[in-house]
Design a protein with these regions (language model features):
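Active-site loop ensemble at the mouth of alpha/beta enzyme cores that anchors a bound cofactor
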Residues: 274-276
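Cys/His-rich Zn2+-binding cysteine-cluster or related metal-binding knuckle/ribbon modules and their
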Residues: 245
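Acidic/glycine-rich phosphate/pyrophosphate-binding loops and surrounding catalytic core
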Residues: 1-198, 202-209, 213, 222-230, ...
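Short secondary-structure boundary segments
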Residues: 218, 241, 263
Length: 276
């Protein structure tokens, strides 16, 4: 999976405008414009790299003379002390782009690292780790790319990717069966329907109505096991809601197909990378 450069450039230019505006009152007054410098991206912890091309693109857009030597690629496992890349170009431009570049690569690597940890915890089970739409506005493509770099899979990218009936949709439509029936009459054959359920009665109704994917929202492990047995061969089962690293393995061992974790994108810790 690669991010289109035209998309990256729009996002990066916006990030640069946020930080630099029209002048850097430190670098522009201290550093001669023709002074050249070098720097390194250095891993300060163990983790998974993501966002290197995005970070380097910050400097490319600021400085036509910028050059970089890469020692790692997105998806690589990093150890503390690893040199990720060496940078060279205008000293002033390296300083101007430093914070924006680090914000992006640290955030994306944090997501990839957290995802890789979750994926390791479910090894040997049937479950896949996915993200959600709980992403930061404007950063969804970068965040979902980072999940893939960490070994996870993407859930819906946006509301047009598939139909997901949550409790509010179901209540507004007059129940699970009626909601699925209404959608089936309007959706194309390529669009799957997922239904959020809160108990086994709702699981049974969703199965009978023909849902392809059933989400188990905050259900107990015992209820998950029963839902998996009920759905066998009929629908995929997704577990979601309040799942932590401590509960991840037991949830996976219930036999669910998918475990979606919003925390991978909405509250992940940044990965420590320095630029010196």
């Amino acid at each position: 999976m690669m991010l289109p450069q035209f998309y990256m450039d729009d996002l990066i230019r916006q990030a640069i405008r946020e930080d630099i505006n029209y002048i850097d009152t430190s670098a522009d007054y201290l550093i001669p414009p023709d002074q050249m410098g070098k720097a390194r991206f250095l891993a300060k912890a163990d983790g998974v790299l993501c966002g290197l091309s995005v970070a380097l693109r910050v400097f490319e857009l600021l400085d036509p003379a910028f050059r970089a030597q890469r020692f790692h690629a997105d998806g690589d496992t990093l150890q503390k002390g690893d040199i990720i890349a060496e940078l060279s170009g205008s000293t002033a431009m390296l300083l101007k782009g430093e914070r924006t570049a680090l914000n992006l690569i640290q955030h994306m690597s944090g997501i990839a690292t957290a995802t890789a940890q979750a994926v390791r915890l479910v090894e040997g089970t049937h479950a896949s780790i996915t993200d959600t739409r709980k992403t930061l506005p404007g950063l969804r493509s970068l965040q979902k790319y980072a999940v893939v770099c960490g070994g996870g899979k993407n859930h819906r990218y946006n509301l047009s990717d598939g139909a997901m009936l949550k409790d509010n949709h179901i209540d507004a439509a007059g129940g699970i069966t009626n909601a699925i029936t209404l959608l089936r009459g309007k959706l194309g054959h390529m669009v799957k329907i997922e239904v959020e359920t809160r108990n086994l009665d709702e699981v049974a109704e969703a199965l009978h109505a023909g849902a392809e994917i059933i989400m188990l929202d905050n259900m107990s492990l015992e209820a998950m096991r029963k839902a998996v047995a009920m759905a066998k061969g009929k629908a995929l089962i997704e577990a979601s809601g309040g799942i932590t690293l401590e509960t991840l393995r037991p949830v996976a061992e219930t036999g669910v197909d998918i475990i979606s974790i919003g925390a991978l994108t909405h509250s992940v810790k940044a990965f420590d990378i320095s630029m010196k």
